[in-house]
Structures are given as C-alpha cells and as structure tokens.
Amino acid sequence: AKLQNLPDDPRASKANVPVLVVSMGPTGSARGLLVRILGQLNAPYGKSASTDTLYPDVLRLLRTSGVKILVIDELHHIEKGNRKQREEALATIKLLGNDLGITIVGCGTIAALRTLRWDPQIERRFEPHRLEVWGHNEQTYGLLNSLETCLPLRHASGLSDDKIATWIINESEG
C-alpha cells in the first residue's frame, strides 16, 4: 500500500472520511466524546449543548462523511467519571455502533478493559488485542522495513538500521 497525500477537493459535495480517530478526552464523558467527534469533522456546536442535543448532529455528520471505522483512543479515561457518567459514555459508544452500523475500535491502557467490563453488552463488542512493547527483535525490524517501503521518499531512510531503530525504540519508549 502506498501512502498518498490527497488534498481536500473543494468541488466535492461532502467530506469522505472512512476512518475517524478521536480521543476520549481527559474527563471520559459522553459529551466530551461527541464534542471531539464534531471537532475532528470541523463542525460547529453550541458550547452549552447537551449530549442529547449533540448526538443527532454527530450521527448525521458521521453518516454524511462516510465514516466506516471510528477509533476512540484513551478509552480508559471513562474510568475517571462516576457511575452515571461511565454508563452514559459506554451507552453513547454502544448507540453509535448500533445506529451507524460501523466498526468501533477502542484503544487505551489495561484500564480500558476494566472500563468495558462495566457493561456486559459493550464488552462483547470488543475483542482485546495487546500491543507488545517494541524491542530489538525481528517483529520490530520487520515493521520498520514495511513502513519504509510505504513512505514516498526519494531515497531509503534506513529505519531498520541499528542506530536509527535504536533511536526510534528509545524515543517511543518501546
């Protein structure tokens, strides 16, 4: 696969965003998630708008933008809320999946798994996959080689050279 830098088409009637990535936000609230989705889609919203007011706008925009996969990072932040807030955040994620029929990918720390376990229905919708820590091993070097072949550079960058690979591993903290 090649990475392409495709500029926005000003003549297009609507945005086409097959994969949308958002962060749960520091409070882990349902409203915060909806506001972040609207922000990623450059959509205006009322600063005091409630979750119930924002939700239909988010649905409409996700549909018209062609979103097929919604990636929610920092899912473990839901844990910061009280029981009612956690239930509302998880219910909102569940409703987005139901109403849109899209794939939702949740990312976060091990606490994200605990968060999902608060709602058995939502827990069944997510299959956990653990990402291993990067190290000086065949998998890491293979990934770096694969990335290098995808980068549209004039000259090879040598990502898997020991010196560069060590720097990447150290800077990313594995």
Residue ranges and their predicted role:
Residues 172-174:
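The conserved phosphate-sensing helix
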Residues 1-14:
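P-loop NTPase Walker A phosphate-binding motif
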Residues 15-16, 64-66, 98-101:
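Short loop/turn elements that form and flank the Walker-type P-loop nucleotide-binding site
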Residues 77-82, 89-170:
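The catalytic "switch" region of P-loop NTPases
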Residues 44-48, 68-70, 103-104, 154-155:
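Short, structured loop/turn "capping" segments at alpha-beta junctions
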Residues 61-85:
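Conserved P-loop NTPase "ATPase switch" module shared by AAA+ and STAND
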